[in-house]
Each structure stands twice: as C-alpha cells, then as structure tokens.
Amino acid sequence: MAHKAPSVITCKAAVVWELGGPVVLEEIKVDPPKASEVRIKMLCASICHTDVLCTKGFPIPLFPRIPGHEGVGVIESVGIDAKGLKPGDIVMPLYLGECGQCLNCKTGKTNLCHVYPPPFSGLMNDGTSRMTIARTGESIYHFTSCSTWTEYAVADCNYVLKIDPKISYPHASFLSCGFTTGFGATWRETQVSKGSSVAVFGIGTVGLGVIKGAQLAGASKIIGVDVNQYKAAKGKVFGMTDFINPKDHPNKTVSELVKEITHGLGVDYCFECTGVPSLLNEALEASKFGIGTVVPIGAGGEASVAINSLILFSGRTLKCTTFGGVRTQSDLPVIIDKCLNKEIQLDELLTHEIQLENIQAAFEILKKPDCVKILINF
C-alpha cells in the first residue's frame, strides 16, 4: 500500500499581530514537514517570561508571530530524513540542538552547538515558514525553533527530543526551558560543590530549578531572595534553607542582607534569576571576595547592563549561560530520569491551567502573587 503523504492541517493558534499587541486566537494552516522536519500535535504547553518578552519584540521584532517555546507533543507526521523519529513519538521541541560532532560539542564544556545554535530568524532552515493565517494566507513567524502556543507545530528534527512517555506531560513542558535552565546552571554550568553556600535572586520557575539543583549538589546554605512573600513556602519545598524579602529591610541592600547571614563573607555562588539590571551588581557584591561565582539567568530583555568593574577585579567570576549549560540530547534525558524516579518533583510548579482560547487571560494571571507556572491545555 502506498504511503499517503501528509496534507495541510487547519487548526487554532495564539498569534501576536504587532509589537506590544494582544495575543489572539486565529485559525491557521500548518504545512506538512519537509525532509528533516516533524509535525507535532501539541499536548500541552506552558508560559515562560521570555514569551512575554516575545510579544514586545524580543529578541527580534518579527510579526505576525506565534509565541511559546515550552511544551510537549506527539509527532503526527515526519519528513523523509527525520532521523530516529516516527509518528506517535512523544517529544519536546527545544530551542537548542546538539550535533555531537562540532568543536563545541566535542569539548563537552558547552551546550552551544555550532551546527544547531538557538535560531532567531523565526523561520525554518530553508528561510520559509510552515504556518500561515488561514483567512489571508499571510506567513507567520515562529518563536525560536518552533512555536508551542498552537495545536500543531513544525520543527526541525535536530531541535526535538524524544522522551519517555511515562513522564507527566506538564512536567515535561516545564523542563523544556525554565526549570531546566535553573537546575542546569548549578549542575552543568558551575558544578556547585558540596557544603557550599548559594544565593538565588528571584524564586520563579528558574529560581526553583536553581534551588533544587543546589540541594541535590549538597549545598549547605541556599538563600532565596524575593519580594513576593508567597515564594518563601515554594522555595522551602524545593530545598531553600533561608529566605530574604528585601521589602522587610528597606534601608539595606540585597547584598548586605545576604552577607548578614553568611558571617559577612557572602556566598560561593549567586544566581540572578530576575533579569533586573541593577541586581546583577548586587549579585556580584553578594558573592565571596576572590572566589565567588555569579550566574545571570533571568531574561530581562535589556540589550546591555552596566557592571561595576571594581567588583570583577576582586577575583569574582561572572559566568553567563543558555539553558543552564544543559545539552539537549546528552543531559536533558538525565534530568527527565530524575523526575521519573522522584528525585526531582515538579508538582508544586503548577499553579494555574487555561485553555488555548483563553491565552490572553494568562498575562493577567502571571501578575498574581501565587502564580508560578501556567499550563496551556489543547
């Protein structure tokens, strides 16, 4: 029997039409996958702060656009060269690839692959889109390697990870960016040492990933810093030992508060997860003189940040990261296994659920103090 070629699919997607505009539900057409691509039926997706920045033109203002880069789905169809993937596979679309053969991949020191780097063009590798507005035929840009706020998406197979179908789909969605970024920053990027001290600025999903990673690494003191008192309880669930709410100490800087509970020394590692530019210098000051390491993780959308060079000359290390240094094919399955064996438990991340058609409401939910992670159901 001849194999039936996949056809165009008409479905619903969340579209941003202009810079700073609302996210609206549109009927779109999704083309079949080309040679090394797969078409994915999304099972669920989630919302990251970077998606909010996407609606504001980050990293490049390309519109109309479908946001979303966290999610999990099932492969509906594959191109003829979609290596190792088949219809029915449960997958995570990712914004990084890993060829395993380029200079960077061979060093084992970075997750930034020369062959499959983070894509920012909003288009597939051939310079075209697989998505169009159904009523007008207008081409739609996707976000990073593919967009997830849509019932169907197309991705290059090199930016897709086949996962164990036993994992909770919401948990898999949370692992496709935020939590993994924080966890990986302690594991892959800095190798947090046993008995060390850690400070985490911002206890959102990324910050909670840092806290759990630091706990599993054996850090003796894990200090969470957040102006939202609700986050204190969340932080403790993931392994935080101390909590600082700067609002309770209006006459002191964050670095002063951190030093007060570290015998005036500061911490071995400080992770800045808010993206607030002024806090980067505070993170540096909160780290130990001569040996402290600071990792900025939060996506603030700022093109540049002023750094006090005198702090750097004091022997501190500033180490930046993408996806926490986690290699998508080599490392991410290890984190998934930790979730499957309950070494990492992610139930506490999920605070709200919405249907795709209510996507605009999510932007108001994000402002609520008890919001950590919003799951989008299809």
From Swiss-Prot:
CDD domains assigned: liver_alcohol_DH_like
Single GO BP term: isoprenoid biosynthetic process
Gene3D superfamilies associated with the record: Medium-chain alcohol dehydrogenases, catalytic domain, NAD(P)-binding Rossmann-like Domain
Top-level taxon of origin: Eukaryota
Cofactor: Zn(2+)
Residue numbers binding Zn(2+) 1: C48, H69, C177
SUPFAM superfamilies reported for this sequence: GroES-like, NAD(P)-binding Rossmann-fold domains
EC number: 1.1.1.-
PROSITE patterns with a match to the protein in the record: ADH_ZINC
Record protein name field: Alcohol dehydrogenase 1
Phylogenetic classification of the source organism: Eukaryota, Viridiplantae, Streptophyta, Embryophyta, Tracheophyta
